[in-house]
Design a protein with these regions (language model features):
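C-terminal catalytic "cap/lid" subdomain
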Residues: 1-256
Length: 256
């Protein structure tokens, strides 16, 4: 493959009233498949939602305060999150295959690093080698922090994880799918292009609900990549991956 992208899908984009939105995952599967076969682009996905799924399984209406309980929710929810992505991505993959008259097989892989592993040079190198190996074979790696074994992970956001992965892989771009259209100005209008993340840009940020990151963490992630010359696209998952990449009127592009 000529190109490599990292796609981060926020919890708020995947869940609708506490349940997995399979249409979002199907459209994502279609998008990454089309990019693979028509634009020589491999995709690495950074996913989240294990804790929320585990909360549902364990009967929690809101996030428990106890970190061990949060970790338990992550352990219960992580297998279900992978199952959901397998089903959803496969639906999009199969739709593309049918349109093109192809016989294709979807394979996904799961990577659950801890923050400490990413900070360790040898372990980080091994993680990256595995991601590139799978991506080059057409496998779609799904990455999530390993909340279930490291109590420090449950309070971290996956925007930062996505940026670190994109930087380490020297990806061609990071796409952050969320439930808003991108960065909005003080009047609620979409900011289509940002070339520098300064105090004026940071002042436009707000928080969010179920996830651990809001627009602030997305800008922090983009700022990290800006220094590396890697562009970041932030946009609403409802438009689909392809439209966000192609149409500058529906997303925020952060690039020099």
């Amino acid at each position: 493959m000529r190109y490599l992208q990292v796609v981060k899908i926020g919890t708020s984009s995947v869940f609708n009233n506490g349940a997995i939105d399979y249409l979002v995952l199907s459209n994502l599967g279609y998008g990454v498949t089309k990019l693979r076969f028509e634009r020589e682009t491999s995709s690495v996905l950074v996913v989240s939602g294990a804790i929320l799924l585990g909360m549902g399984e364990k009967g929690f209406a809101k996030k428990p305060d106890d970190k061990m309980e949060l970790q338990s929710c992550a352990r219960v929810g992580q297998p279900k999150l992978m199952d959901a992505y397998d089903i959803g991505l496969r639906a999009g993959y199969d739709r593309y295959s049918k349109e093109k008259g192809l016989s294709l097989r979807l394979l996904i892989s799961q990577v659950l690093p801890t923050y400490h592993q990413l900070d360790n040079t040898a372990e980080r190198r091994n993680i990256v080698a595995g991601l590139l190996h799978d991506a080059n074979q057409g496998i779609i790696p799904l990455i999530n922090y390993n909340d279930g074994v490291d109590p420090t992970e449950v309070t971290r956001d996956n925007d930062n994880l996505a940026a670190r992965i994109a930087k380490t892989l020297v990806a061609d771009r990071l796409v952050i799918l969320t439930d808003v259209d991108g960065l909005l100005d003080a009047d609620g209008r979409l900011v289509r292009r940002v070339s520098e993340i300064n105090d004026d840009v940071r002042a436009l940020c707000n928080g969010n609900g179920n996830g651990t990151g809001g627009m602030k963490t997305k800008l922090e992630a983009a700022d990290l990549l800006l220094k590396e010359g890697i562009p970041t696209i932030i946009g609403n998952s409802k438009y689909g991956l392809l439209k966000l990449i192609e149409n500058e009127d529906v997303r925020t592009l952060i690039s020099r």
